[in-house]
């Protein structure tokens, strides 16, 4: 990496895409985590944004090297919180500070928004990601249960 990692917000708080070029450039890295995303990636993300999600990307040397999708909401248990739907760094650039840069940005944003908690889920098979989250001071606080409908 020649230039420092910078974080670019893709959409605003109303869900409007403000960086269409970066949204398109995010797709290959995002698919490293979510291979099942549909071919109409931009339309899918617009629907996700319409439901309150935000997206930012980590950029270096004019390339997207990391993606985060997140949302701020309030519930009865944690109050106002940030929930991270997706967090992925380019598999060819792992352990280069990308995940930490994204997490730092997200946590700063969460604090600025008055969030009391920062949450994410990570698949049970993602042991490397779990080690990263533990190193970053995160702890397992619950089990997430799911059932296909």
Question: Which residues fall in each region the model found?
Answer:
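A conserved beta-turn-beta hairpin within the catalytic core of GNAT-like acetyltransferases
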Residues: 73-84, 94, 140-141
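Conserved beta-strand in the GNAT
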Residues: 57, 63-72
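A short helix-loop-beta-strand connector motif used in the catalytic cores of GNAT acetyltransferases and
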Residues: 46-57, 83, 139
């Amino acid at each position: 990496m020649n230039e420092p990692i910078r974080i670019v917000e893709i959409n605003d708080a109303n869900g409007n895409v403000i960086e269409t070029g970066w949204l398109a450039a995010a797709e290959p890295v995002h698919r490293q985590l979510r291979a099942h995303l549909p071919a109409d990636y931009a339309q899918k993300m617009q629907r996700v944004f319409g439901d309150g999600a935000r997206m930012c990307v980590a950029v270096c040397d004019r390339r997207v090297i990391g993606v985060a999708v997140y949302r701020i909401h309030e519930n009865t248990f944690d109050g106002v919180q940030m929930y991270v739907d997706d967090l992925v760094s380019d598999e060819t650039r792992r352990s280069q500070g990308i995940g930490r840069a994204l997490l730092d940005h997200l946590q700063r944003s969460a604090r600025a928004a008055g969030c009391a908690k920062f949450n994410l889920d990570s698949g049970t098979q993602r042991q490397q990601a779990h080690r990263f989250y533990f190193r970053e001071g995160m702890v397992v606080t619950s089990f997430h249960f799911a059932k296909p409908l």
